[in-house]
A protein has these predicted regions:
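N-terminal helix-turn-helix DNA-binding module of bacterial transcription factors
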Residues: 1-56, 366-369
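An alpha-beta-alpha
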Residues: 176-217, 224, 315, 323, ...
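Short helix-capping segments at alpha-helix termini
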Residues: 90-94, 145, 213-220, 245, ...
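Flexible loop/hinge segments that line or gate small-molecule binding clefts
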Residues: 131-171, 284-292
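Hydrophobic alpha-helical
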Residues: 125, 129-143, 209, 227-286
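Hinge/cleft segment of the Venus flytrap/periplasmic-binding protein
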Residues: 213, 303-371
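Amphipathic helical "hinge" segments at domain boundaries
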Residues: 50-112
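Hinge/beta->alpha junction and helix N-cap segments in small-molecule ligand-binding domains
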Residues: 70-78, 99-110, 131, 165-175, ...
Length: 371
C-alpha cells in the first residue's frame, strides 16, 4: 500500500471520523473496542505509517539541546559547530532550541559544562569528552533522567551515552602507519604527536598506528607518543624538544588537528621539507601550502562538519521521532594528498556556498554561549 496513507484516508475507508481514527491509533479513550480493532486492521491493510514529526509539531512541545564542545583547536571544532548549525536549520520548524556551550579544551571544563546542562533541564546533550571516566556518573544521571547523550568526535566508552558519531579512529591510525611505512621503505625512526592518550580518539589512533607500522615494517622504530594536551604552545615546545633529542627522525604523524604549531616548530629548526616525511590530520587554510609544497605528504581528513551534522540529526530523530540510533556511527577518513587536494578544496567551498545560500531559508533557535 501507499506509504503516504493519512489518518483521513482510514477514516474515509471506514466511514468514521478523523478524531475516532486518531484516538484509536494513539490508544486514547472514547473508542469502543470493536471500532478500535477495525481501525487498527485497516491501518495495517493500507500500510499506514505514523508520522512522529507531525505529532511532535501538533503537540507544540519545545525541545532544548545543549551542545558542549571545546574552544581549541578552533580550526577543527568551529567546523563541527558549523555542521550542527547547518543541521539545526533543517528542522527549525520543529521547535528545537540548540544551545552551544564551549569549554577551553578537551579534558578542561567539560564536567562543569555538562553539569550546567543537566541543571538547566535540557532534553538532550551532545558532548565531546576528553575524560569519559570522569563524566561516567553525570552521564548515568542524565540517562536516568531520560536525557539522551550523544558523543561526537570521540567516544565515551563504558558510560550510559546513547550513541557516538566519530571518525573511524583505528582506521585513521592504521592508514597513517601504512603510508609512513611504505614511504620510508621499511627503515627509519618515526614519532607520533598527539593530544592526550586519555582521550579515546587519540589512544585508538596511536595504538592502531603502532600496530600498522609493526605489521608493514617491523624494522621501523616507533617512539613513545608526544602528548601536547591540545595546547598550541605545548605542541610547539614539545616538538622542538623532540627534534633536538632525535635529529635523525625520519617520519612524523600528527594525529590531531593541532598541527600548525608543530609544523612551525619544524620550519624554525629547518626540518620542514628536509628529509622528514610528515602526515597530518584534517584540512584547514594554513595547512594547504604545506601539502602543495610536499612538506606534508598526506593529511587524514576527519570530516568534522559531517560529524556535527550527524550527531545532531541522530539526537533529533531520537527525541522527535522516537527512533533509536545505532550505538556507534564511525565515518571513514579521507586521505588527502597533493594530487587530490583541489577536489576537496572545491567540495568544501561548494558546501560553504550552499550553506550561505540556505542561511535565510530557516531561522532555528540556536544560541551561542560560553561556559
Amino acid at each position: 500500500m501507499s506509504e503516504s496513507t493519512k489518518i483521513r484516508d482510514i477514516a474515509q475507508a471506514l466511514g468514521v471520523s478523523i478524531g475516532t481514527v486518531d484516538r484509536a491509533l494513539h490508544d486514547r479513550r472514547g473508542v469502543n473496542p470493536l471500532t478500535k480493532s477495525r481501525v487498527l486492521q485497516m491501518a495495517k491493510t493500507m500500510g499506514y505509517q505514523p508520522n512522529p514529526a507531525a505529532r511532535f509539531l501538533s503537540s507544540k512541545r519545545r525541545v532544548r539541546i545543549s551542545v558542549n564542545l571545546p574552544a581549541q583547536i578552533a580550526s577543527f571544532w568551529d567546523t563541527v559547530r558549523e555542521g550542527i548549525d547547518e543541521e539545526a536549520r533543517t528542522f527549525a520548524a520543529f521547535g528545537i532550541d540548540v544551545e552551544l556551550h564551549t569549554f577551553p579544551r578537551m579534558g578542561f571544563g567539560e564536567q562543569e559544562a555538562f553539569d550546567a546542562a543537566l541543571e538547566s533541564k535540557v532534553n538532550g546533550i551532545i558532548i565531546a569528552t576528553g575524560r569519559p571516566q570522569d563524566l561516567r556518573g553525570s552521564i548515568l544521571k542524565a540517562s536516568r533522567a531520560r536525557i539522551p547523550v550523544v558523543s561526537v568526535v570521540t567516544d565515551a566508552p563504558g558510560t550510559a551515552r546513547l550513541a557516538v558519531v566519530s571518525i573511524d579512529s583505528p582506521a585513521s591510525g592504521a592508514l597513517a602507519g601504512e603510508l609512513l611505512s611504505r614511504l620510508l621503505q621499511g627503515q627509519g625512526k618515526v614519532a607520533v604527536v598527539t593530544g592526550d592518550l586519555a582521550i579515546t580518539d587519540h589512544a585508538e589512533k596511536y595504538n592502531s598506528f603502532r600496530a600498522s607500522v609493526n605489521a608493514f615494517s617491523p624494522s621501523v622504530q616507533v617512539m613513545e607518543p608526544i602528548q601536547n594536551h591540545e595546547d598550541e604552545t605545548e605542541a610547539y615546545e614539545t616538538c622542538r624538544t623532540l627534534l633536538r633529542a632525535h635529529p635523525d627522525l625520519n617520519g612524523l604523524y600528527i594525529s590531531t588537528a593541532n598541527s600548525a604549531p608543530v609544523l612551525q616548530a619544524l620550519a624554525d629548526v629547518g626540518r620542514l621539507n628536509d628529509h622528514l616525511t610528515v602526515i597530518t590530520t584534517d584540512l584547514f587554510p594554513a595547512l594547504i601550502p604545506h601539502i602543495e609544497s610536499g612538506a606534508v605528504v598526506a593529511t587524514l581528513y576527519q570530516r568534522p562538519k559531517s560529524q556535527g551534522q550527524l550527531a545532531l540529526r541522530m539526537l533529533n530523530e531520537f527525541l522527535v521521532g522516537g527512533r533509536c540510533p545505532s550505538h556507534q556511527l564511525r565515518l571513514a577518513p579521507h586521505v588527502i594528498m597533493k594530487s587530490n587536494l583541489s577536489f576537496f578544496l572545491d567540495r568544501i567551498s561548494m558546501e560553504s556556498e550552499m550553506e550561505e545560500s540556505n542561511a535565510f531559508a530557516a531561522t532555528p533557535k540556536l544560541r551561542k554561549e560560553s561556559s
